[in-house]
Every structure is written in structure tokens, then in C-alpha cells.
Amino acid sequence: YIGSGRTDKYWEVAFYGGSFSAIPRAWQEAVLAPAYEALLEGKIDGIRCSTRPDALALEDVDFLLEHGVTTVEIGVQSMDNQILQMANRGHNRQDVIDAVGRLKEKGMTIGLQIMPGLAGETWTSLVETAVAIKDLRPDFVRIYPVLVIENTDLADAYRAGDYQALTLDQAVAYGAFLKDYWEAADIEVIRTGLQATRELDQGRGLVAGPYHPSFGELVENKRWRDRIQSLMD
């Protein structure tokens, strides 16, 4: 399909769904090779991947850059060390800061993924995460409120009463706040809420949490309502 001709669109090969830079180097090279060839031939305009901050040592960043990766998205989730530990993320705040610094030094485009609603989060910790992300100056951010999925430790904690999921109204309010805050700092928020799927729409595998197929629209509606209300007050 790529070889059928170019248009004025921006074409990109993306490797999502896991921590790309953490898989064996030979596997990375095997899938990057055809993408890099297409990039060199002008058939695509860029390559991006998603990964975790503690899998972005200098040698990892150099490898990605040498194989044509132009954008890296990092699963940050929170900048609160206690929350990250409770979620068993395996990384900490400093790992994020270091990873972003290395990517910036190499001139790569940086995206950060944030998950409001993790266990232990408070309004104060959410605001502190928002400020920390602003200070890192990424090129863009994605906001994914936590959903409780079947057959996970979080589902067990939810059923045991040890975790309380965000309501839809809470998640929309958080999303509106974060988007307002980051966009005021000229940081683009390119997505709020998970991409709708047939499984999620039918509730399959979803135990709890603020899923809505039009979550992004709900956030935008909230932002506009708040602006109008502020003008009326």
C-alpha cells in the first residue's frame, strides 16, 4: 500500500502496544529495518514507538535514532514516586526526567502518556504531576484515565474494595483541567481517553472505570461550559 504512491499526507510507521525499546535488540532491528528502508526511500515520513522511561538508556536512544525513529512516546503515568510504586510501574520520577533529557539531546520528538486515577492519587498529586510534565516541555501529551480491566491485579483490588475507580464525571473534570493547563503552556494534548473499540463499547473485559466512546468530546464540552460559566459569573 505504501508503494502505491504518495499524497500530501504525513505517513508514519508506529510501534505501539508495549515497551518497544525493552524487547530484544534483534527483534527491534528486524521490524525497524523495513520501516527505515521505507523512510530512506521517501515512502514514509517518520517512525515512532512507545516505551517505558527506564528502557531509554543512552545506548537505547542511539539505537532508535540510528534506525530512523523520529518520535518516542513514554508511558509516564504519574510523576509521583509513591503512586508509581503502588502501581508496580518499575520506574520512578527521575527515570522520566533522565529519559526525556536524553531524547531532547538527540533532537527527537517526545510524547508523554499520563494516567489519571491510579491508586493513591489525590488532587494534589495530580496537580504536581501536571506541573512536572509542563516543566519537562514534551512536544505532546496523551491522557488516558485508568480503566479496570478483567484478569488484572487492579481488578482484584477493585473487587476487594482496595481501589476506587474514577467516575466518568471525575475523569472528564481531570481531563479538562490537564488539557487547559498544558495547552496554556503550549504543550499539545493529542488525545484524551482510549480509542473506542467494539470490545470496550460492549463492556467486554471492562470491570470499572470512566470509559466512554466519545470521552474526548465530553472533555471539550466541559472545557467550553467552564469558559462560558466564568464569563457569566
Where are these regions (language model features)?
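Generic hydrophobic alpha-helical segments
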Residues: 1, 35, 228-232
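Alpha/beta catalytic barrel-like cores
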Residues: 1-4, 9
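Glycine-centered flexibility motif
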Residues: 5, 117, 151, 209-210
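Auxiliary Fe-S-binding modules of radical SAM enzymes
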Residues: 9, 153, 160-233
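Low-complexity, highly charged intrinsically disordered N-terminal segments
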Residues: 10-14
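Conserved non-cysteine loop/helix-boundary elements of the Radical SAM core domain that shape
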Residues: 17-169
